[in-house]
Amino acid sequence: RDVALDGRREVNDAFRKTVAGTGSYDTIVPKFKALVDERDPNLDYYARGTFTSHNLDFAEDVLSIADAGFDRLSVEPVTADPGCGYDLTEDDLPKIEAEYDRLTDIMLERKKEGKPFTFFHFMVDLDQGPCVVKRLRGCGAGYEYVAVTPDGDIYPCHQFVGKEEYRMGNVFDGSFDMGISGQFAKQNIYTRPACRECWARFYCSGGCSASNLLVNGDISLSNEVACKMERKRLECAIALKAIAAGMGETENTSRNNTECNQCGFCQ
């Protein structure tokens, strides 16, 4: 459902290159646009990008994607090894938070101009939302789904691939470590110390285990930089909902949770 596009040509081509080593923007954008134009209009899609410390003005990349003809967008913070040169740090947060505020203003202005677009991280359901189980533990890595490599090795999700201590088994020999699965199944907003007192816990549902491991070496210890970005996005999302309500608007700016059937608890 997603097509990968990081925004402006120079931003995209810095990381997304062809096999020949050249930038991919001019090749992929016309193809992505044709794909989106021909899709079933009842099916969601997202033009999904990533921002790094090299493009903290990422609202410009959101606008670039929108101006390229896409109206369902997601530009997300990079997950990268600390110190790699493009990872996001605490020092970047003031610029990132200001950019989310700027993006909020841009979206309001675009709406007035009759050129609205959807930004995934600014979607929040204040009326219903997901079931209580999903509010307590949003990520199903390791127990609701797994990642399987071409060699058949099983990991909790794609971000754990190569981390031998989290290899759960192999599809070819039939092995599967239920102990690792149970370790992930026990994760929730009350087992993670930083989540317990966080006002955003029932919207965030505990964050990403892989991100926690990458930054803190423990899937239970929250990545505080990621947490601060999530809280800022939620502030912007709630502000947009409040402004829309004040204008008497009723259009949907919520993620669709009506078809959630992943965990089976509500069946």
For the regions a protein language model found, what residue spans apply to each?
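Conserved residues at the C-terminal ends of beta-strands
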Residues: 4, 76, 201
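Radical SAM enzyme [4Fe-4S]-AdoMet core and its adjacent flexible, acidic
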Residues: 10-29, 33, 37-141, 145
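Radical SAM enzyme core and accessory elements
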Residues: 151, 190-267
